[in-house]
Amino acid sequence: MQRKDAKTIIMYYRSIPEMKRLLQQERRELEDEYCGLHGISMDGMPHGTSPGSPVESAVVRLAESGASDRIREIDSRVQVLEDDQRYIQSALDAVNGRYKIILTMRYINGYSWGGISARIGAPDSTVRHWDSKALLRFGKALEDAGETGEILGRATRARV
């Protein structure tokens, strides 16, 4: 695997938590939009905002809008993101400690080369050289685990 592909995948890994958060927020909004139950009144019975059975009307609105399909799609996308996150994390864990630190600091935590150099206690040029090697080792770890092509495709589409 080339360094640019490994970099694309690790940047995708960095963005997975935000992507999951946005999908879960969209799911909550869809559920809130079609849930007519706003609370329980003082008599202990649920009361909705629409006439008839509140659950019935919510199910009808949900079915008519296609929101249930979108909710299922969101759930499957979140599951794919979680699987990708575990897969990439396991490949990152397979990389040597020094290289893993550089990859984590640079691509996940967003440190500058100078910041990494100061934290590690090595010259800037050495840190850049180690980064180059780290990306190659990370790419090799991804290839050894399999499924790299699919994840690279999703990572490339996510970065567009």
Predicted feature descriptions by range:
Residues 1-91, 114, 140-160:
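N-terminal interaction/assembly modules
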Residues 120-144:
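DNA-recognition helix of helix-turn-helix
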Residues 103, 115-118:
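Hydrophobic positions on the alpha-helical face of helix-turn-helix-like DNA-binding modules
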